[in-house]
Amino acid sequence: MYDYLIVGAGLSGAIFAYEATKRGKKVKVIDKRNHIGGNIYCEDVEGINVHKYGAHIFHTSNKKVWDYVNQFAEFNNYINSPIANYKGSLYNLPFNMNTFYAMWGTKTPQEVKDKIAEQTAHMKDVEPKNLEEQAIKLIGPDIYEKLIKGYTEKQWGRSATDLPPFIIKRLPVRLTFDNNYFNDHYQGIPIGGYNVIIENMLKDVEV
C-alpha cells in the first residue's frame, strides 16, 4: 500500500516524491515515457549532454531555492547570452545597448530612445491590425525586419501579417550593455545534466 501515487517523473513529481519519502511516506512514481525527468530529460549524444526536449537553464533569485537544487547536483556557471545572426551580422538578444549599437551605432540610452521614437513615429496613431504592425509600432521597422519577422514566421508557420497583434504585447528593451538573458542572481545548468538531479531525488523511490 502506497501513501502517494505520483503521475509524472518530471521535476515537480520528483520533488514531491523526494520530500514525501523524506517524511516517511511510501511513494510510487509512474510515467508514460520510458525515462525519468520529464521535459528536462537529458541524453548523451557522442559525449555531448543534450537536452532532449529543448534547452533548460535554471535561474532564480531565491537563495533557498538555489541551495535546495544544489544539494542534488553541482551547477556550472553558464550565463545565457543569445546572439542572432542576420545575414552575417550578429546581434545580442534580448534587445540591449549592444544590439542597438550594432544596428544603429547608438552609444547612449537617450540616443536609443530617440531612435526608437523616430522609427515608430508613423505608427503613433495606428491601431495595429496584425503582428507586423504591432511589432513595428513597438520597436520600429529595422529591428522588426532583422530580428523579429523571420523568427516569428518560422515559429508560427505563417506570415506575420496574418497573425493577430495580441501575440506581441510588448518587447523587452534593456538600456544597458548587459547581455545576460536573465535578471536572476543565480543561474546555471547542472553538471552532467538534469538527470543527475532527478536520479538523486528518486534514488530511494519506487519508479
PLM segments and residue spans:
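Short, solvent-exposed loop/turn segments at secondary-structure junctions
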Residues: 11-12, 34-36, 98, 153-154
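Alpha-helix C-terminal capping segments
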Residues: 20-22, 68-72, 198-206
